[in-house]
């Protein structure tokens, strides 16, 4: 389907690239054109300081974390593994990913709140996918300790899981903090809510990893 439907000039390009990268990883074959085109356009859309535009324009939302940066680094990792031309951009994108994760850690207030910015806020703390992914990759900046990320993300989850978050059958309701269906965008459904689970990426770390075993640390805004 991704080959029949032309993606719009936005983060959608990365979905086509990701599907082709998955085919390359699992079958050894793919159409490289969507991959190279998505990379070309996002290089052009980079705005600086770890932020990409969602298309040509800058949008103040969390799509750098929901889609753009995590999927770019994953596509580039597959390209690097399979020695695809253009994979050398991996190192550049990795530094941008780490920079954005650094900023995300600083967005978390002492109370565990964070700015409600732009669309798709019904994905709740999935907004911290980049911070979670960089933690899982064990590539946090030196001045950010894994334990402070653990404590910060835990505080966010405890703060945000308000009454009304789940329905009577245990499914996530639409909302940001509790049940707020009016916050849902037209493309959001109950299934979309589960993008919030990307905050759990550090669960991929071993049980004896420093992320889990180190003593609690204050995160930046608490310090």
Language model regions located:
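Terminal, non-catalytic domain-edge segments
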Residues: 133-223
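Aromatic-lined, polymer-binding surfaces characteristic
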Residues: 1-94, 105-132
């Amino acid at each position: 389907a991704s080959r029949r439907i032309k993606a719009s000039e936005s983060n959608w390009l990365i979905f086509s690239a990701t599907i082709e990268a998955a085919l390359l990883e699992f079958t050894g074959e793919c159409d490289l054109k969507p991959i190279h085109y998505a990379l070309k356009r996002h290089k052009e859309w980079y705005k600086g300081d770890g932020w990409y535009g969602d298309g040509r324009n800058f949008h103040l939302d969390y799509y750098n974390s929901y889609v753009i940066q995590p999927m770019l680094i994953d596509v580039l990792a597959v390209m690097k593994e399979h020695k695809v031309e253009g994979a050398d951009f991996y190192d550049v994108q990795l530094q941008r990913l780490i920079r954005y994760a650094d900023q995300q850690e600083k967005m978390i207030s002492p109370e565990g709140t964070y700015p409600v910015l732009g669309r798709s806020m019904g994905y709740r703390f999935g907004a911290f996918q980049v911070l979670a992914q960089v933690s899982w990759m064990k590539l946090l900046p030196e001045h950010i300790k894994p334990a402070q990320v653990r404590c910060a993300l835990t505080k966010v989850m405890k703060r945000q899981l308000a009454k009304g978050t789940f329905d009577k059958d245990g499914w996530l309701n639409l909302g940001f903090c509790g049940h707020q269906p009016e916050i849902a965008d037209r493309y959001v459904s109950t299934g979309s809510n589960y993008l919030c689970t990307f905050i759990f990426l550090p669960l991929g770390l071993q049980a004896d990893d420093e992320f889990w075993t180190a003593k609690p640390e204050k995160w930046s805004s608490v310090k």
